[in-house]
Regions:
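Accessory DNA-binding and partner-docking regions appended to nucleic-acid-acting proteins
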Residues: 1, 350-352, 381-603
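Helicase motor core with emphasis on the C-terminal RecA-like subdomain
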Residues: 1-8, 12-16, 20-42, 50-52, ...
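Short helix-to-turn junction characteristic of helix-turn-helix DNA-binding domains
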Residues: 25, 221, 272, 362, ...
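Flexible coil/turn residues that form the inter-helical turn or adjacent wing/linker of helix-turn-helix
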Residues: 160, 225, 365, 415, ...
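Short, charged low-complexity linear segments at domain edges
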Residues: 347-376
Length: 603
């Protein structure tokens, strides 16, 4: 088993749980696997496929994901193919013939195509196992429900002797139970890997408005020169606006959302995978279909609707284990809009609960990673040291006067205002709505003009979290003072607020700027700290040339992590090259000579 792992994938040992899952599947038993993005789920069914007679059938929701997986397998010397509507009939006919003749070890197929072929092609194949990837799509409780997945339950009826492995990166308890029920899994063993991704840094910025977000995004990307990233936006129009802003600043960007033609979406994805653009500005539709291992950053322009969605989306970064950064912007406007969506949905109580947990993460003043892990049932007593709260623990001050000013303005407006107009009143802005409604005559008009608007938005988020007011979602999102707020307003209680740090001070504390080519030693990546940045860039250039020759994404030739290891260890023979973790026999023979010749020039 280990020899096969080394030969095809280049690894000397398994990651946690992988060997147990593989042995369980080799015993022809069903399994449900929960493992984070980048945790090594694919090997859990790809290795058994190589060790078993016949063909493994892998159900995947997106053609682009199938393409990526098949290219990766073929680059490792493994016979694999994808049966889908993007192929012409000749190509699909050839694939069907190869399956019936047992020439493929893995066949990737969509749920719709699987059902169409269930009584035809699949009956004529020797199937070693079924793998249901992105299995959370089968559950209406999951965050990415796809109705066509619900018919996968027919597999055990038609092929009772074939084991099924269902895999997902995120699924809470109710979703796990639904997956097992819908697929009719037979006494499955549930494998739950640690959801911790220590290589991902976690940062939240609260109360930012559009201009401030744009500046923060540009500063953030400037710390990642030439490195790929994704910006998730709540709306299509916002994705387009952000992409235009980046383009004007000379950052090559693409847009991806459901309103574009499939050709435009495919083009955007292809440009991103092949490093022709640095950033993709997208709605939640983007990301599941890619296996790009060297995404170095993910930004959420808006608050996601659930921790599952958030975790899956930040999981696009750092799949190769290298240091990667995530940034979430959080505002009251997002919270109000998402609450409305959740209230109007068919699953109001569940969606509101999920949103509340996401809100708790964004407002946290304790280690953010502990909150994420706790949500997935994994408790830890240690802080991560790699989130903004751990790096810069919050300091508090007596903010009673600030809170009283805000609550007084709410009270004097007869609790008939939302957050936007409240900030205008406090700042003394003569907006049309303020003057039309006579709020410029209030005693509190301009009472907080010394506090920047962004800080007011942050303080209002804190006040909401502290329970000083509530949002009446059924009354145009007006703010209503609570009993706790009344106590502060009339001096019966004091209010402690978190000090808002200026960006410059935060960066000075963090000392965060790092070169794109040098791994951060503190992170548990197992990487030596002796590599040459110059050699790494030369290796990256060679990798790009080889990838272009084969019309492959660069990360499929060799991952960034492998390039870092090559740069640090500098193998001077093909045999030494093949000993690097992540380089299998096929890649050693195919690429060893050219990479070793280049490395010798730097030795």
């Amino acid at each position: 088993m280990l020899q096969t792992l080394k030969t095809y994938f280049g690894y000397d040992s398994f990651r946690p749980l992988q060997e147990d899952i593989i042995r369980h599947l080799m015993d022809r038993k069903d399994a449900l696997v929960l493992m984070p993005t980048g945790g090594g789920k694919s090997i859990c069914y790809q290795l058994p496929a190589l060790l078993s007679e016949g063909t493994a059938v892998v159900v995947s929701p997106l053609i682009s994901l199938m393409k990526d997986q098949v290219e990766t397998l073929c680059a490792n010397g493994i016979a694999a193919g994808a049966l889908n509507s993007n192929n012409d009939e000749t190509e699909n006919a050839s694939l069907r013939r190869a399956c019936m003749e047992g020439k493929l070890k893995l066949l990737y197929i969509s749920p719709e195509k699987l059902l169409a072929e269930a009584n035809y092609l699949l009956r004529d194949m020797h199937i070693s196992l079924f793998a249901i990837d992105e299995a959370h799509c089968i559950s209406q409780w999951g965050h990415d429900f796809r109705p066509e997945y619900t018919q996968m339950g027919i597999l055990h009826q038609l092929f009772p002797q074939v084991p099924i492995i269902a895999l997902t990166a995120t699924a809470d308890k109710i979703t796990r139970e639904d997956i097992i029920k819908q697929l009719h899994l037979n006494q499955p063993r549930i494998f739950i890997s640690s959801f911790d991704r220590p290589n991902l840094s976690l940062t939240v910025k609260r109360g930012y408005q559009q201009k401030e977000k744009s500046k923060a995004i540009l500063d953030f990307i400037a710390r990642h020169p030439g490195e790929s990233g994704i910006i998730y936006c709540m709306s299509r129009s916002k994705a387009e606006t952000v992409a235009q802003m980046l383009q004007k600043q000379g950052i090559k960007s693409a847009v991806y959302h459901a309103g574009l033609s499939s050709a435009r979406r495919d083009e955007a994805q292809d440009d991103f995978i092949n490093d022709r653009v640095q950033a993709v500005c997208a709605t939640i539709a983007f990301g599941m279909g890619i296996d790009k291992s060297n995404v170095r950053w993910v930004i959420h322009y808006n608050l996601p609707k659930s921790i599952e969605s958030f975790y899956q989306e930040i999981g696009r970064a750092g799949r190769d284990g290298m240091p990667s950064d995530t940034l979430l912007f959080y505002s009251l406007a997002d919270l109000i809009l998402l609450t409305k969506f959740a209230t109007d949905s068919g699953q109001q109580s569940i969606n509101l609960e999920k949103l509340q947990r996401m809100q708790q993460y964004a407002e946290a003043d304790i280690c953010r990673r502990r909150i994420l892990l706790s949500y997935f049932g994994e408790n830890t007593t240690c802080d991560c040291g790699n989130c903004d709260v751990c790096k810069n623990p919050p300091e508090r001050f007596d903010g009673t006067i600030i809170v009283q000013k805000a609550l007084s303005a709410i009270a004097r407006s007869e609790q008939q205002i939302g957050t936007g107009i409240l900030v205008d009143i406090l700042r003394g802005n003569m907006s049309s709505e303020v003057t039309e409604r006579g709020y410029h005559r209030l005693k509190t008009f301009g009472a907080g003009r010394e506090v920047p608007a962004r800080d007011w938005h942050d303080y209002l988020l804190q006040m909401l979290q502290l329970g000083y007011f509530e949002i009446a979602y059924n009354e145009n999102n007006h703010l209503k003072i609570t009993q706790s707020g009344t106590d502060v307003l009339f001096g019966r209680a004091r209010a402690l607020l978190v000090t808002i740090r200026r960006e410059e001070a935060v960066q000075a504390t963090r000392g965060r700027k790092r070169k794109a080519t040098v791994p951060t030693k503190e992170l548990p990546l197992g990487l030596p700290n002796t590599e040459s940045g110059e050699l790494f860039e030369a290796l990256r250039t060679l990798r790009k040339r080889l990838a272009d020759q084969e019309a492959l994404p660069a990360y499929i030739v060799l991952s960034d992590k492998v390039l870092h290891l090559l740069s640090a260890s500098r193998p001077t023979t093909i045999e030494e090259f093949g000993n690097i973790s992540g380089i299998g026999e096929y890649k050693k023979k195919k690429y060893g000579k050219e990479f070793v010749e280049l490395i010798r020039k730097y030795s």
